[in-house]
Every structure is written in structure tokens, then in C-alpha cells.
């Protein structure tokens, strides 16, 4: 039973980018349950930050430190890392969670729209990781978790930029492992499946005639689990990858998808 202590996050500080709500917020809650010392999060403007702080307060989570920062701003990120070190302490765990998606057919997508997705979903994890890694190297210890996607492996209509970014993030995860594993830094990814969030609620509502939304039917048929996943189901994998229990796991993407990637589908 003593090995269960390896899953403890007691005494650790975790920075989760874009964790005002959704996946990042639920990972933060799981970290708190595992004994984390401090949660650090950022959002892109003051209004979003205040909404996030209110969510943490409502959840009864203390020891939360929120900052305004655009993770695509390299200068701003470096300044924030210095501020975190001064005000909170070392960053033991980094979760690159902030992300966006634009659902536009590729031939209709403007280059600026494509570039924005790449900047937020791929370049930003590089910027933030590069700013945090030097101090981890000095301590010879650190955990980095990149929020990847099933689109790190699969394509789908209208998400060319997102799939390109998340595929790149999978390879960035592997390369951080390759480059910094000798410093006892573990970099892994989590690839969420289809998650039941307020944003996806309209896709899961019954239609006026009582039938299921076509996309709801599609996802449940494609998923061996036969259902959408709960955001809290990402918490356990995140705690594992943030804790000493995963010290021998590096460069891996853990797909929490209910089995979609393993499933070819039922025969008609």
C-alpha cells in the first residue's frame, strides 16, 4: 500500500494554462484531491481570469494563483515565469492545456485563421515549456503534460489546422522527452476523447421529435464505451502523469477516449 504514496502531489506547485474552466479546471480539481500545494493558472484577459477565480472559489479550492497572460506572447510568458517563481515558488508540474479550434473547411480557411490555431495549440506549448524547463533542469526534476487530442492521430473534416497542431504537439511531447529525459524531466500527453461539457451540451440534447442528435448518435456508436466521457475522468490520468508513479513513463500520449482509437466500428 505504501506505493500509493507515489500518486501524491503533496508539496508540489502546478501551472495549468487556460484552466479557468473545462478540462484544465477539472485537472486542477484532481490535483487538489491529490494534495497539491498550489494551483497556478492563467487566462488571456482580466474578465476570463475573474471568471476562473470565481469557479475555484465556488469549488472551495484555496491556494490558487491566477494571472493574465497570453501564452503565445514569448516575452509575456517569460515574465510570468519569473513572477511565479518570485510569488509562488518553483513550477514542479506544467500542464499545457490552453487551446482553440476552428471548424472551417481547409479550402475556405484563411491563412491567419490557420496560423492562429497553430500558434495557440502548438507554438504556445513550446514557448511555455521552453520558459519552464531551465529551472527544472537545475533541480533535475519536472513533469510536463501536454493536452493532445484524438486528432493527434486521426483526421476529420473541417479541423485541418487543429489536427496539424495536435499532431505536432504529439511529436513535441516526444522530443521534449528525448531532449530532457536525462534531467529527470518527464513529458507526456493526454489525448481526450469526446467530453461532455457545457460546450457540447447542444450536441447531446434530445431533438424535438425525441430522437438523439445525429452527432450524439455518431459518437456513442463510434465509442466502445457507448457514451460521452465526463471531464472528471481525465483527472486520474493527469494525477498519474504528474506524480512519481509515472517517473518511468516518458514521451507517451495517454488517450482517454473510451476506446475510439482502438475501434473500427460495428458491422452494419
Language-model features: where?
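C-terminal substrate-recognition "lid" of short-chain dehydrogenase/reductases
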Residues: 141, 227-256, 261
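Residue(s) in the substrate-gating loop at a strand-loop-helix junction
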Residues: 149
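Alpha-helical segment proximal to the catalytic Tyr-Lys
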Residues: 134, 178-182, 247
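Short, small/polar-rich loop/turn modules that mediate ligand/substrate recognition or access, typified
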Residues: 95, 181, 186, 249-251
Amino acid at each position: 500500500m505504501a506505493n500509493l504514496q507515489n500518486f501524491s502531489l503533496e508539496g508540489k506547485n502546478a501551472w495549468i494554462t487556460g484552466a479557468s474552466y473545462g478540462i484544465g479546471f477539472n485537472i486542477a480539481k484532481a490535483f487538489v484531491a491529490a494534495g497539491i500545494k498550489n494551483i497556478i493558472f492563467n487566462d488571456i484577459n482580466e474578465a476570463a481570469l475573474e471568471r476562473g477565480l470565481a469557479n475555484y472559489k465556488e469549488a472551495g479550492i484555496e491556494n490558487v494563483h491566477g494571472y493574465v497572460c497570453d501564452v503565445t506572447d514569448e516575452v509575456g510568458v517569460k515574465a510570468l515565469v519569473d513572477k511565479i517563481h518570485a510569488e509562488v515558488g518553483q513550477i514542479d508540474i506544467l500542464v499545457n492545456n490552453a487551446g482553440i479550434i476552428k471548424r472551417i473547411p481547409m479550402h475556405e480557411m484563411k491563412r491567419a485563421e490557420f496560423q492562429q490555431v497553430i500558434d495557440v495549440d502548438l507554438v504556445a506549448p513550446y514557448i511555455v515549456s521552453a520558459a519552464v524547463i531551465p529551472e527544472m533542469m537545475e533541480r533535475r526534476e519536472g513533469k510536463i503534460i501536454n493536452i493532445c487530442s484524438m486528432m493527434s492521430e486521426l483526421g476529420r473534416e473541417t479541423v485541418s489546422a487543429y489536427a496539424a497542431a495536435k499532431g505536432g504537439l504529439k511529436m513535441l511531447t516526444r522530443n521534449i522527452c528525448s531532449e530532457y529525459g536525462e534531467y529527470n524531466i518527464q513529458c507526456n500527453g493526454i489525448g481526450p476523447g469526446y467530453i461532455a461539457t457545457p460546450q457540447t451540451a447542444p450536441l447531446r440534447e434530445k431533438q424535438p421529435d425525441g430522437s438523439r442528435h445525429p452527432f450524439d448518435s455518431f459518437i456513442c456508436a463510434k465509442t466502445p464505451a457507448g457514451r460521452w466521457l465526463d471531464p472528471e475522468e481525465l483527472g486520474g490520468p493527469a494525477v498519474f502523469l504528474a506524480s512519481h508513479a509515472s517517473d518511468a513513463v516518458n514521451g507517451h500520449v495517454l488517450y482517454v477516449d473510451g476506446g475510439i482509437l482502438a475501434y473500427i466500428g460495428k458491422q452494419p
